[in-house]
Amino acid sequence: MDLRYQTGFGSYFETEAHPGALPVGRNSPQKVPFGLYAEQLSGSAFTAPRHENRRTWLYRLRPSAGHEAYQPYAQDKLVSAFPGPATPNRLRWSPLEIPAAPTDFVDGLVSLAGNADAATLGGIAAHVYLVNVSMKNRVFYNADGEMLIVPQMGELTLVTEMGVLKAGPGHIAVIPRGVRFRVEVEGPARGYVCENYGAAFRLPELGPIGANGLANPRDFEAPVAAFEDIDTPTQVIQKFQGALWAATWDHSPLDVVAWHGNLTPYRYDLSRFNTINTVSYDHPDPSIFTVLTSPSDTPGTANCDFVIFPPRWMVAEDTFRPPWFHRNVMSEFMGLIHGAYDAKAGGFVPGGASLHNCMSDHGPDVASHKKATEVVLAPHKIDGTMAFMFESRWVFRPTHLALESAALQSDYDACWTGFPKARLS
């Protein structure tokens, strides 16, 4: 499928899949063209400041309101409340295996950790998805938060109310709270999801960097209008207050013929990130790699930062170039899309994950430290890699499933054993 996109982060778009479907000069005329139904999707309170206000007007074949009551839907691997004890221990997981049984995106979501619940309107949850079939006659939406999807294996086709996005390894996609979508795959697919209960992701402030750098607004892509006119029973599953609920509609809800607004799904190619780094000495703080941020009520302290560690040149003189040893007030959930991470010589592999909570000691392993302290420093490019981090002010609590999983590496702490003691003489 040859898809078209509209470009710009947080831009105001208008698009129609059928000529003349968009009303002119008003949002909800007495008679919408072609008898379509006008519906506003609000992503913020009506009275939110203009620069924070997000909403889109949808013009659809049938009103969304015409459906039966929702009933509970069982999916015990996906959770949104994390009552279990937090742990100060460093945790690392090997990739979880994709099931042999047919499993679509909804049934393939597995929660690893989180630091709030949906009712708080703050915090995040970190999930993985393990998928081998497309969603068929099913549509999903999340009333609890927006979903930042990080594919690691296999391309996803995201068929949304507002159009179609494709996202494979090296891209991310963000689906706003409440937007309905279906996930289609060509084969096995695995990746990560940051479920954000707090303020919507936005671009970070650039400060002294200036007007350009990091993720540039023009590189974000939103879909153009596309719709389904399908009168086939469709199961609509929603996530509401941490639980899944399902109802059968008599048609596909992906029937939006035209829309205008600034609340949209979008995708971003991580290879377009304009990486900032030192050209003199030292390893700057990893905040320079922030792609998107969800702010909290404390300025400069994020509900969640989405950070990447992309290909980049290392040129610092008289410097230990990998990430240094660290104890952080923030908590860090990491994943690896492809390649290797420069602070870990082994064990942290594509599709895996790690968790370092607030003030948990972490840093390079013995092999990486030895190599970095002995290498002859010359300009060097770290290439063929893409790691990422969901960093949050809130401590993550791992799920029972994550702690009991065979993928949990029981020997993770061993990577920091064997450092020789410094000698003062």
Curated annotation (Swiss-Prot):
It comes from the Bacteria. Keywords: Dioxygenase, Iron, Metal-binding, Oxidoreductase, Phenylalanine catabolism, Tyrosine catabolism. CDD domains: cupin_HGO_N. One of its GO terms (molecular function) is iron ion binding. Its EC number is 1.13.11.5. Pfam families: HgmA_C, HgmA_N. Pathway: Amino-acid degradation; L-phenylalanine degradation; acetoacetate and fumarate from L-phenylalanine: step 4/6. Belongs to the homogentisate dioxygenase family. This is Homogentisate 1,2-dioxygenase. The lineage of its organism: Bacteria, Pseudomonadati, Pseudomonadota, Alphaproteobacteria, Caulobacterales. The gene is hmgA.
